[in-house]
Amino acid sequence: MNKMINPRKFSGCVNKMRQFFLQKNFVEAHTQNMRSILAACEDPKTISTYQYAGQVWPLPQTGQMWLENVLLNNPDYEGTFCLSTSYRNEPNPVPGRHDLMFPMFEFESKGNMNDMQNMQIELLDYLGFEKTNGSYPEGDYLDIC
């Protein structure tokens, strides 16, 4: 069962992330209401559905595809971000790793992988994360998991 995230901590964190991206001239997009299979671009076996206006739709897992669409249709934007709720139907959720419903803050921007990594480092600095020996841990995704 989900428990409520501390509202003060949630608000503080989300507002700080919003400030970071707004200062970079990113535009916030609302993706939660978009009804499309694009909202379920993670693992198709973990999709939950709902019925709306006589059709079955996937509950959104991510706003990623919509954010990419916003950038493609607005090339003058530096980037875009959204805050949404992700719904997952993990068959074997691992406690502490797989929540079935959770808030998600996502962003998309122009650039390459180095640009993305640099932005993530800037965001971690902005949020006040501590570095170890002057940097953040790095590694191959599969090794870290």
What is each stretch, according to the model?
Residues 13-17, 116, 123:
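Alpha-helical packing segments of well-folded alpha/beta enzyme cores
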Residues 1-110:
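Class II aminoacyl-tRNA synthetase-like tRNA-binding/catalytic domains
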Residues 111-115:
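Extended, domain-scale alpha-helical bundle/helix-rich regions
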